[in-house]
Amino acid sequence: MSSKSTKRAKIEDPKDNVFMVEKVLDKRTGKAGRDEFLIQWQGFPESDSSWEPRENLQCVEMLDEFEREFSKREKPIRKRHSQKPEPSEDQADPEEDKDEKKETNQNDKFSLEGKQLKCIVGLTKGPGELHFLCKFSDDTARLLPAKEVNSRYPSQVIRYYESKLTIQDPKADEL
């Protein structure tokens, strides 16, 4: 991003505390259909980043710039429409084609193709399942189901759990 990304912006909470926005990390559509932004707070670790609706933020220029950059990298690829060739007797069963398409759609469900996982920032329990907060090499962060992260990035998951593991000496308990 340009030099504007280093600007500081404010958010005010009801207690009149002012928090400075260091960086906008990601964007999503919230439950109410409103745009929410993943905010990196100045003076706080990235693990304290939070999703905030636009109306809670006073950093209009920073949000507009992020949206311009976000729209550049999120443009859909247009496909040319051509006539489909007549099916031949050699072609595979249409049911098999549907299964393959379904499998491909599952792989693209989280839009992770080509993304390199930089690190796992945290772990949380959502409704019914665990989710990892993952940071990618392009400095975006996403909350993903643990099943998806376990299958795509198993070594990173092990590394994350190892970093959180504490081992106690059983002999120390006897003293």
From Swiss-Prot:
The keyword Aminoacyl-tRNA synthetase does not apply. It is found in: Nucleus; Chromosome. Its main location: nucleus. GO terms for biological process: dauer larval development; determination of adult lifespan; germ cell development; gonad development; heterochromatin formation; negative regulation of gene expression; negative regulation of Ras protein signal transduction; negative regulation of vulval development. Signal peptide: none annotated. Interacts with histone H3 when di-, or tri-methylated at 'Lys-27' (H3K27me2/me3), or tri-methylated at 'Lys-9' (H3K9me3). Interacts with Tar DNA-binding protein homolog tdp-1; interaction may maintain localization of hpl-2 to gene bodies. Interacts with histone H1 his-24, probably via interaction with hpl-1. Interacts with chromobox protein homolog hpl-1. Residues 88-98 have a biased composition (Acidic residues). The lineage of its organism: Eukaryota, Metazoa, Ecdysozoa, Nematoda, Chromadorea. Residues 99-109 have a biased composition (Basic and acidic residues). This is Chromobox protein homolog hpl-2. Residues 71-109 are annotated as: Disordered. Keywords: Chromatin regulator, Chromosome, Nucleus, Transcription, Transcription regulation. It comes from Caenorhabditis elegans. Disruption phenotype: Causes ectopic up-regulation of transcription of specific genes, such as lin-39 and lag-2. Causes accumulation of double-stranded RNA transcripts. Splicing defects. Results in increased levels of spliced xbp-1 under basal conditions. Increases survival in response to ER stress inducers tunicamycin or dithiothreitol (DTT), as compared to wild-type. Knockout in a chromobox protein homolog hpl-1 mutant background has no effect on the distribution of monomethylated histone H3 'Lys-9' (H3K9me3) in chromatin. Pfam families: Chromo, Chromo_shadow. Residues 19-78, 115-172 form the Chromo domain. The keyword Transcription applies. One of its GO terms (cellular component) is chromosome. PANTHER family: CHROMOBOX PROTEIN. Seems to be involved in transcriptional silencing in heterochromatin-like complexes. Probably does not act as global transcriptional repressor, instead targeting a subset of genes. Involved in RNA processing mediated by Tar DNA-binding protein homolog tdp-1. Plays a role in linking epigenetic regulation with the innate immune response. Involved in the endoplasmic reticulum (ER) stress response via modulation of the unfolded protein response (UPR), acting mainly through the IRE1-XBP1 pathway and perhaps, to a lesser extent, through the autophagy pathway. One of its GO terms (molecular function) is histone H3K9me2/3 reader activity.
